[in-house]
Amino acid sequence: MIKRVLVVSMVGLSLVGCVNNDTLSGDVYTASEAKQVQNVSYGTIVNVRPVQIQGGDDSNVIGAIGGAVLGGFLGNTVGGGTGRSLATAAGAVAGGVAGQGVQSAMNKTQGVELEIRKDDGNTIMVVQKQGNTRFSPGQRVVLASNGSQVTVSPR
């Protein structure tokens, strides 16, 4: 029984690692963005600042639930009678807290905040994932916009 739970838990944790955060980068386009007309403008990088991008929603409880189930199961294997019940409850609480912490850490990615002075004189701020491209102040860039999202690339 323990082997089955551990195998299911490991498979679940492995699948969580398959999340693709690369779409936050200026180097990657989603399938729906391909072959779409985008407005293009040009500008110059004024300032670059490293940031962290927190993906997902803090109220997302999948990690907490998974951790609570696993913690409760492991706690249930300890002791007998009242001690087993207390160990199950403590394991579920500790597992829930640990699971939520793991999920939160997995949802973070390194990003870059770009302050850009466009050629029309307006200054904008864009945050995107730090991809292969490294930006620096004074660098010329191209901005591709579909109306709701902007992608910054070197010119």
Curated annotation (Swiss-Prot):
Signal peptide extent: 1-17
Induction of its expression: Induced by low extracellular levels of magnesium via the PhoQ/PhoP two-component regulatory system.
Xref: Pfam families: Rick_17kDa_Anti
Membrane topology, as annotated: Lipid-anchor
Assigned keywords, A-Z: Cell outer membrane, Lipoprotein, Membrane, Palmitate, Signal
Subcellular location: Cell outer membrane
Record lipid sites (S-diacylglycerol cysteine): C18
One of the record's GO cellular component terms: cell outer membrane
Primary residence: membrane
Sites of N-palmitoyl cysteine lipidation: C18
Family statement: Belongs to the Pcp/SlyB lipoprotein family.
Protein name stated in the entry: Outer membrane lipoprotein SlyB
Gene that specifies this protein: slyB
